[in-house]
Every structure is written in C-alpha cells, then in structure tokens.
C-alpha cells in the first residue's frame, strides 16, 4: 500500500492530543467575515459548479452533498471532478474515514484518503471565497462545504459515528452558515447545537457524528464549511511539498487557545 510520504514527518509525535477538547469562537473575535458574506460566496460557487453527493462503492447519498474547497492535481481518478474529490469515491466501502480499511484502493497516495494531496484551491473557489480562506494562518488541505438535506428525516440512533485524522495533521474548523434546531453534533457523550456566526474546533480523533435530535421539519438544508488546516506544516504551493513549520510539536490545544490558526 502506497502512502503519502508526508506521514513520515509525524512519526513519534503525539497524535492523540488528548488535552484538546471542544472550542468555540465567534467569527468576529477571530477576525473572520460574517456567515452571511461567506454564504453569499458559497451560493455563487454552487450556481457555477453545482453540488456533488457523497459517493461510495455501494451507494450515492443525495441527502449529503456539497463541493470541495481544495483538490489534488494528481488525483488517481482523472475523470472525477476536482470539486468532488473530497466527496468520496467508488473505491471506498465505508461512509467515513479509514478506520475500517482502504476498500478497493491499491494505493492511498493521491486517493480520497490522501489528506495531504488536497493542496490546491481552484480559481472559482478563490474568486468567491478567497476573502475568507486567506484569513487563515496555516495551509488549507482536505476541505469542503457540506449540505445536509434532512427534511423529513428521523434521528438515527447509532449511525454516522467516526473519527478523523489526528488534529496535529489536520485541524478542522467547522463554521455553520445555515442551520436549524434539529441539527446537532454529538461528541464525547455530549450534544452540541452549532450556531451561525460561530466557528467550532474539537478533537476529531475522538468519535463524533452529525445527527438530528428530532424529525427535521426545516426544508432548507444545513450548510457548513468544514475547513481543514495543517497546523504543524508549511506548504510550497507550487510543488505541493510540505515541511515542518515553526509550531511543529506545539500542542494543538495551545494553538487553538492562542488563536494562532487565524491571521
């Protein structure tokens, strides 16, 4: 199995970051644009490229769709849209993550599972969301805008639980742009309602899931930006080569608490 060599940089590091928990900030205190302005950019992009459903070997999920904010110029499937690269693949078996195996992949480098391969921001994305993306201090890797079309859905008692990459490798910033009271995040035996106007960061190496607390009666989709940052790495944008940055090894909890992820 061929992996991205960037993984070697993290050998011997603390990938659990167990002191890193749940954090929330207002967009204003982070110096970020308003949710309304970000949503305007998202809608402009949607009008130009459309939305792409989550795809696996066994099914296509139309109720969960969106578009990628980053892409891999060397992606293994040349026919797949650059905007759908982070929306699964017909080679993967499971709904989330790599914890249950690689599916039909013969290599992980330059596949859906290659987090560090998603090193480029498309011109259309930059045109309409550059004012937002440029406000972050770290390189942007695997990132997406995610829509959940949950109207009529009932709560799922046990589905959707997953873990993501270690936060020292990919630190996710979750920003709700459009939501309603039915939608929540469950993490560490707690339930959180994410509010428009805030940004959330939590330890995604711990099991968590998006879900509903009751039948969804809101017809408009839930829309979140899920931005993945590389807090310990610098990126050469021309060559897509990563190197350790000056914060390499600094606890993620301190990076977030000190707001070092924004300019």
Residue ranges with predicted function:
Residues 1-135:
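Non-heme Fe(II)/2-oxoglutarate
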Residues 20, 170, 220-222:
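A general secondary-structure signal for short beta-strands and their flanking turns/coil
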Residues 23-25, 143, 173, 208, ...:
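A broad, low-specificity signal marking well-ordered, structured residues that form hydrophobic/aromatic
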Residues 104-121, 167-174, 249-261:
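Short N-terminal helix-initiation segments at or just after the protein's N-terminus
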Residues 126-203:
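Catalytic core of non-heme Fe(II) oxygenases with the double-stranded beta-helix
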Residues 179-263:
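Catalytic core of Fe(II)/2-oxoglutarate
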């Amino acid at each position: 199995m061929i992996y991205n060599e960037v993984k070697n940089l993290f050998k011997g590091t603390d990938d659990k970051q167990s002191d890193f928990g749940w954090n929330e900030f207002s967009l204003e205190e982070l110096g970020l644009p308003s949710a309304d302005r970000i949503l305007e950019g998202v809608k402009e992009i949607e009008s130009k490229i459309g939305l792409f459903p989550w795809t696996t070997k066994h099914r296509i999920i139309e109720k969960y769709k969106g578009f990628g904010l980053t892409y891999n110029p060397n992606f293994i499937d040349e026919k797949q849209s650059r905007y759908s690269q982070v929306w699964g693949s017909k080679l993967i078996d499971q709904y989330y993550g790599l914890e249950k195996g690689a599916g039909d992949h013969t290599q992980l480098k330059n596949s859906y599972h290659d987090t560090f391969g998603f090193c480029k921001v498309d011109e259309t994305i930059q045109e309409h969301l550059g004012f937002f993306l440029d406000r972050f201090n770290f390189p942007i890797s695997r990132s997406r805008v995610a829509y959940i079309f949950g109207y009529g859905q009932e709560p799922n008692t046990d589905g959707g639980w997953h873990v993501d990459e270690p936060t020292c490798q990919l630190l996710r910033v979750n920003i709700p742009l459009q939501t309603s009271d039915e939608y929540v995040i469950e993490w560490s035996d707690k339930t959180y309602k994410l509010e428009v106007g805030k940004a959330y960061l939590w330890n995604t190496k711990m099991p968590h899931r998006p879900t509903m607390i009751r039948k969804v009666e809101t017809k408009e989709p839930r829309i979140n930006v899920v931005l993945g940052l590389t807090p310990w790495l610098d990126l050469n944008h021309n060559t897509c080569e990563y190197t350790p940055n000056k914060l390499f090894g600094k606890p993620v909890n301190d990076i977030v608490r000190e707001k070092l992820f924004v300019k």
